[in-house]
């Protein structure tokens, strides 16, 4: 399973760990992904999504039914 938010499309990015001695080693910054069940009132069922914290805030703001309609329109779910 890929580490990508189903709502925002956020995925891992790369960067450096930097030590006190300023040594740099490559690392990955992973998105804050959570598996979350959302109740869809129009369908009378739960939908399970893998979303980032930002994705959850988007769903809180716009509503799960609007976000699901966009995901289905774009073929993401």
From Swiss-Prot:
GO terms for cellular component: cytosolic large ribosomal subunit. Keywords: Ribonucleoprotein, Ribosomal protein. GO terms for molecular function: structural constituent of ribosome. Pfam families: Ribosomal_L28. One of its GO terms (biological process) is translation. The keyword Iron does not apply. Residues 1-20 are annotated as: Disordered. InterPro entries: Ribosomal_bL28, Ribosomal_bL28/bL31-like_sf, Ribosomal_bL28_bact-type, Ribosomal_bL28_sf. The keyword Ribonucleoprotein applies. HAMAP family: Ribosomal_bL28. Belongs to the bacterial ribosomal protein bL28 family. This is Large ribosomal subunit protein bL28.
